[in-house]
Structures are given as structure tokens and as C-alpha cells.
Amino acid sequence: MPRKIESLFLAGPAGRLEALLEEPDQAAVGIALVCHPHPQHGGTMHNKVVFRVAKGLRRSGHVVMRFNYRGVNLSEGAYAHGEGELDDARVALDVLLSRYPALPLTLAGFSFGSRIALRMGCAPGGLAPRRVIAVGFPTVYKDRAFLDNCGVPRVFIQSTRDQYGPVEELQPLVDALPEPKQLIWIDAQDHFFAGALEQLEESVIRLG
């Protein structure tokens, strides 16, 4: 039987938001929200890295929601410097939680989206996700106060040749963070995991 894929429009703060909801082939063990990269640099929910992360989560038994930030493809509104995009992600998360309130939550994101996921997951207020998966975390952004004193389990997955989050910058950053945390390096050609997308997907599956 083909898996269920539902196309949605969510009521976002700047207009409707385009989203996709995918259920796993097996009984669901959790839910996951996946945030895409920077909307002003071609980022969409159909980005190949986002797709692979979402696929890995679905294959490991998660109901997965992807969405487009305001102003991307069929989502209404305009870029809002990260703050509006964070609000968009919260709307998508609320919809996901309302549909599956009893399942444990994973937040995930790629590049700019990894910051959005971490900001949501590490914010005070009782969200308490099972974990946050930060793929291709960009160290070029220096405002990282949201990582301080974050007790949520965080998994960083990074290309060994990431030009926006190189080894020599990300390794000490993660080393300095409080537990629980994990850093997975993948031998890929660039920030977008060229030549290693299958390994990325398998790494997500192994997280369970």
C-alpha cells in the first residue's frame, strides 16, 4: 500500500504556508518537523538534503512534516530575517502536535533550518522534544546564545568539507556545549553533502 502523503496549507502569521505531511509505512514511533535552508538562497522544503533527512526519519517510523517558510513557492508573505521564519516553524509544529499529541517529537533542520530547529527545541517553555537533529549547522552566524544551557539532546550531522561550518569551527563549538550531544561527521564534498546523500539518510535512520 502506498504511503500517505498529504499536501496542506497552514494558517501562518503572514498568510498561508505550504506544507507536506508524510506517514511511515509502519506504525509510527514518533513525529518530526524538518526545517529547510535559507529562503533567500534557494532553500525550500524540496531541497535534496531536507528530502533525505525527511526520508530517513520516515523510514525509521516517523510521521514527517516539511513546510515552506513565508514567501517560498506557494507560501504567502515575505522573508522576515529569521524571526518570522521561526514563527512559521512554530505554526507548523503546532499543527503537527495537534494531530499526533501522543507521539515523541524530533525537530530537524538543514543549514539555516538547523538554527530554526535548535532555537525552537532549546527555548524555555516546556516543549521538551526527544531531540534536535541539526544538519549542516552554519558557524558563519555568530549569534548562538540559544545553544547555551540547552539540555535537549542535540545531534549534529556535518559534512567534513562544509564551507559554512568547517571542522575547525564546528568541532570546538560542539565540544563546548553541555550534554547530551552527538556530532556525526560524513565524508562529503560540500555543505550540501554532495556524493554522500545516501550516507546522510542512513545516518538519520540509525538514530532511530
Question: What does each model-found stretch correspond to?
Answer:
Residues 152, 165-174:
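Short alpha-helix in the alpha/beta-hydrolase fold that links the catalytic acid
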Residues 87-152:
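Primarily recognizes the serine-hydrolase "nucleophile elbow" in alpha/beta-hydrolase
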Residues 1-8:
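A domain-start/cap signature at the N-terminus of enzymes
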Residues 150-151, 155-158, 162:
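Short beta-strand/loop motif that positions the catalytic acidic residue
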Residues 10-12, 16-102:
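Serine-hydrolase catalytic machinery in alpha/beta-hydrolase-like enzymes
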Residues 160-165, 191-192:
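Acidic catalytic loop of the alpha/beta-hydrolase fold
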Residues 176-192:
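Catalytic histidine neighborhood in serine/cysteine hydrolases
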Residues 194-207:
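Post-His helix in hydrolase/transferase enzymes
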